[in-house]
Amino acid sequence: MELMKKNIHTERIKSKALLQVPLETDINVSDAKPDVAKVIYDCGKIKVDEIKTGMNKIWVKGRLCYQLLYQTESEDKSLAGMEGDIPFMEEIYLDKLEGQDRVICKTSLDDMRVHIINSRKLSIQAVISLEPRVEESIAEELC
């Protein structure tokens, strides 16, 4: 009877964190768009563009991409839309981070509100969650 050995490669979570970030910006309605009477619908999605690692910390660079649908102030009360993004860059401390470790960042949009300042200007307020985790590769030999 022969003893068989197999190598197993697994990923283990070394460290993780949770950071909630408030984002706020005012946006102007472009001259080509009609005036805003009422915001009908808003939605957003977080996109992570880059994750840089340092000694026990990471920098997450990304943007909140939003889309808005609004009712215009025209006589026919037609609908119009606009979209854009809000950039962010956050520094997050993570214990036990080393150069060869893999960092994965899970994101979620917790809250987003759009308020009308005037017919040509809107305020967007959002709270996003960044949940980075550090994974390391482990190779084990099983008999």
Predicted features and spans:
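Viral structural modules
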Residues: 1-143
